[in-house]
Amino acid sequence: MYHGMNPSNGDGFLEQQQQQQPQSPQRLLAVILWFQLALCFGPAQLTGGFDDLQACADPGIPENGFRTPSGGVFFEGSVARFHCQDGFKLKGATKRLCLKHFNGTLGWIPSDSSICVQEDCRIPQIEDAEIHNKTYRHGEKLIITCHEGFKIRYPDLHNMVSLCRDDGTWNNLPICQGCLRPLASSNGYVNISEFQTSFPVGTVIYYRCFPGFKLDGSAYLECLHNLIWSSSPPRCLALEVCPLPPMVSHGDFVCHPRPCERYNHGTVVEFYCDPGYSLTSDYKYITCQYGEWFPSYQVYCIKSEQTWPSTHETLLTTWKIVAFTATSVLLVLLLVILARMFQTKFKAHFPPRGPPRSSSSDPDFVVVDGVPVMLPSYDEAVSGGLSALGPGYMASVGQGCPLPVDDQSPPAYPGSGDTDTGPGESETCDSVSGSPELLQSLYSPPRCQESTHPASDNPDTIASTAEEVASTSPGVDIADEIPLMEEDP
């Protein structure tokens, strides 16, 4: 009838034909069975034998669904299974079993019939959105709210509603959309995740290029409220790379910034020479500008006339000089202090001796056993000595030889009867006046007045007189020859 075509479910005529087709063989089988029984038991039992056969009643087919098997006689042990069409779900048991009850009759277990009810629409999975209701039935509208920075967009711009269909599906399902992922340059990178496809309003991204490439365009892009970027994505253009810098004999170069894998635009090279060599020019830098080195000149290192010590050696030499100078100064100060201490101790044991002071008013003293002893001045010593000699002696002071005036005694040695002074007497006078031993006799203990005795009686009279003359002579420094204290014998 349908010429090999599969009719749709729910066709009443087809279901009726399906129910009638399986029943004919079963009835034919029942008739054959009845005739066999009639042959065995006789014609008297033909009527009651067919009526004794028992079967379960037809369980029926649920609306908007179907059953397997769809028709026939359900004897004891038969099973009926139930299914629903799309958009519906089964409410009840999926299968029923024909069994005999305790009273001996047959029935379906479970006894409740299964039905097909309309299915609810499932909650859709929408990224960057929040769905308010948890269940939606046929004909209900979908209610969602997009996250901050995202806006709702429908496939059908003329229909801004999404409804739940009777088959449990949604029509015109919306999405929450932001700015779409911008293109990235193959020679650069952007600060976004590779899995992120949509960006909320206000998002700012930036682009960077790999070394050797220059950014052409805006480095920063912002997602605007109309869900487009503030500008087109930039490009990374290749820069012209400078060749290898010129080589320097007895030197080398370093580049800034380091390391220099490629001499890109803006790279700076600094030249330097080996120890003992120096650059011929004060300028030691060249810069890569659009594939060329600027300034373009050859760098040379020449041998230095004077080799300057290294910084370490210079510091070491400086510290040596400072240490030597400080040590010398400390040593000189120590020697000065020791000399001063020695001079102080020497003066305490040996008072200084020198010419008499010009001023007679300044007193001199020495310290003897911790007790200061006043010394006579030069004038006092001279006046005291002259007063002790007497008036007769003063007349002969101006002459070269001091002789007593009152006493004209003969000489102390025989054969000398001449009263005149000879050459020998003059020499004796000079030797006596210059002898330092005569000065010591001035401070010897006083003796008895022997001036009245004649000079011839005592040979020491001449020496004593000479001593007195020497004490009055201005050419003799009495103060230097006077002992400060008497030494023990």
UniProtKB/Swiss-Prot annotation:
Residues 449-474 have a biased composition (Polar residues). One of its GO terms (biological process) is negative regulation of complement activation, alternative pathway. Keywords: Disulfide bond, Glycoprotein, Membrane, Repeat, Signal, Sushi, Transmembrane, Transmembrane helix. Residues 54-118, 119-178, 177-238, 240-303 form the Sushi domain. Residues 41-318 are extracellular. Coiled coil: none annotated. PROSITE patterns: SUSHI. InterPro entries: SUSD4, Sushi/SCR/CCP_sf, Sushi_SCR_CCP_dom. Glycans are attached at residues 103, 133, 191. The keyword Cytoplasm does not apply. Residues 1-20, 400-489 are annotated as: Disordered. It is a single-pass type I membrane protein. The keyword Calcium does not apply. Its main location: membrane. Disulfide bonds join 56-98, 84-116, 121-164, 146-176, 179-223, 209-236, 242-288, 273-301. This is Sushi domain-containing protein 4. The lineage of its organism: Eukaryota, Metazoa, Chordata, Craniata, Vertebrata.
